[in-house]
A protein has these predicted regions:
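Basic- and aromatic-enriched surface patches that contact anionic nucleotides/nucleic acids
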Residues: 2-22, 26-37, 47-173
Length: 173
């Protein structure tokens, strides 16, 4: 029988992602992850989905500290206290790019910006209230406490490679 992984479903505000990153607790570049592959158009479309309330897939993370606390010892000491992103790197990177001023979105999408007439804005162009409103958007997370990078990779591969790209058809139908 396959062991159940027991991922916990949570909703967290976007600000938690920034907090984890700024504290050095967010691991976006695990060995099984690809690099940053989303272009500007895809990033903007994702942000529009997020801001308009379209459900987006949950981000899958591994709470390595929780795994270590439960007796897992297969992580290097420097990595034992991090949240490793198993699935959702492109989404979280896009959010952080916006917050950090590296991605601009149409100004008409936001009510609270420092320049009311700005055609394009990033998180650094929002007022304190505007940034708080954005940062309080909730995102779904699936949180695991897997004991090793190998188990993280297994989940990553099941989520990303077990299906077909849209438009493809299985040959064994």
């Amino acid at each position: 029988m396959l062991p159940r992984l027991n991922l916990q479903q949570t909703n967290r505000p976007i600000d938690v992602v920034r907090h984890w990153r700024d504290a050095g607790d967010l691991e976006l570049n695990t060995p099984y992850q690809r690099g940053d592959v989303w272009g500007k158009a895809r990033r903007i479309a994702f942000m529009k989905s997020l801001l308009t309330g379209i459900p987006i897939p949950s981000v899958i993370i591994n709470d390595r500290f929780g795994a270590t606390d439960r007796g897992a010892t297969q992580f290097a000491e420097a990595d034992q206290y991090k949240y490793a992103v198993i699935d959702g790197k492109q989404r979280l990177t896009t959010i952080l790019m916006f917050v950090d001023g590296e991605l601009q979105l149409p100004g008409e999408w936001f009510d609270h910006k420092t320049d009311p007439d700005a055609a394009m804005v990033s998180g650094t162009d929002l007022t304190h209230v505007g940034l708080r409103l954005f940062s309080n958007h909730a995102m779904g997370f699936s949180e695991a406490t897997l004991p090793s990078i190998e188990r993280e990779r297994e989940v990553f591969e099941l989520v990303n490679f077990a299906g077909l790209q849209q438009g493809q058809v299985d040959t064994d139908i």
